[in-house]
Amino acid sequence: MATKNTKIKNLNLESAYQFGFAMPERPVFKTAPGLSEQTVREISATKAEPAWMLQFRLQALKTFLSKPLPQWGGELTEINFDTLCYYLRPADQVRKRWQDLPPDVQKTFDRLGIPEAERQYLQGVSAQYDSEVIYHSLQATLAKQGVIFLDTDTALKKYPDLFKEYFGTVVPPADNKFAALNSAVW
């Protein structure tokens, strides 16, 4: 019977994380660190959202501030929410072709091991980099079948009524502190 230490050693937990790298930030927009009503308003204004979405975000922020840290999962008490940046836009627009992505973004996905052949095969994907979807491609066959597959910002702009009806219904902001955080600053 293997001991606990042997099992941990076999997991190779002390080796370097193969995806542990960082790319330099070159955002076209970034909020200041910290979470406040001003931060939420700035995100909403930058995205030119309707008033009801701003109200949704502000209510989610109130929920976030009032909820305790969840007890499930790892130790979370050392998170300093005032030092985090909650919104960073790495590009000025969503790209529909892989070739149109900035080279440093392409390099990131290459380093993550997503080969060109897989990118070409999938074609019905969105890729998020920092706070924004920066690449979106949908197979024409899905669109012909009436499938609506959009990044969140585009969905809000193109289908506001549908969006308002369903957004935040699977995991509502009141579910837990982090659901509320996501709803406030997505």
Where are these regions (language model features)?
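Glycine-rich and polybasic anion-binding loops at the starts of cofactor/ligand-binding domains
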Residues: 2-186
